[in-house]
Amino acid sequence: MDGLGQRVLVIAFDGWNDAGEAASAAVSHLRAAGEYESVFSVDPELYFDYQYTRPQIRMEADGSRELVWPDATLWRPPYRAEGSRLWLLTGVEPARAWQAFAAELVDAALSEDITGIVALGSMMSDVPHTRPISIFSGSDNEQLRTALGVERPTYEGPVGILSVLGAAAEEAGIPTIALWASVPQYVAGYSPSPKATLALIDRLVEISGAEVDRGQLPAEALAWEASIDAAAADDEEMTEYIHQLEAARDTWDSPEASGDAIAQEFEKYLRRGGEGHGKPGRDDPRR
């Protein structure tokens, strides 16, 4: 197997796997950049709790209103004679029947001859907004890890729908990789997070070979970072916290840093009142 192949399905879901809306915004950006057509949607009555995920009223251009139900939809890209193509799967994390939900969507992927899957997720982490957004790239598929040079996940614990879909896809013979962006936890009020969205798309392009127009994302990422800088400038406690995170991140990233130096830096960070749980941006409760 040579990587993901040329018919790649990119997955993101609203909800638990989507801190700062970074993952869902990445798929929305991809869809807006191309002429996609819907090829499959699940029956919302089977999978969603409308008291938890309510239908929405949307205004149309002519002034009429449309009732929109929560869903999960597979989108097909326009035809290209050469190069990788990106199918999209996006929607709301289901409230029930996850195994049936995953089986339906994997069957739809097989009907589209999908050769590989990339699941996008994002999580709140103890990382600074002033540094590059870290992306964890992991796969349970040994051949894919070798081909792409990504890590093997070691997390044990509760998971989201991305993990369930990934396991079902692997069982069906579709190699799957997960990309997780670390979103600074102190910027929860600054969603969406275009810097994290851009980092996910950049990494997706690296591993898939697909061509993606970034559009206004780079400018939006800079504006997002500047808005947080401005907020921190008026908040001494926030500024100090960011400096602590920067020191921890810089120590971790330093090529000459020894294991002891890294441990000492994190001990100092924790003594100052940080609530980190290990490497910055690498502890992922959803992998």
Language model: regions and residue ranges:
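A conserved C-terminal secondary-structure "cap"
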Residues: 187-287
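Flexible, glycine/proline-enriched loop segments at strand-loop-helix junctions
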Residues: 13-17, 89-98, 148-156, 187-191
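Internal, conserved structured core segments that host functional sites
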Residues: 84, 92-143, 165
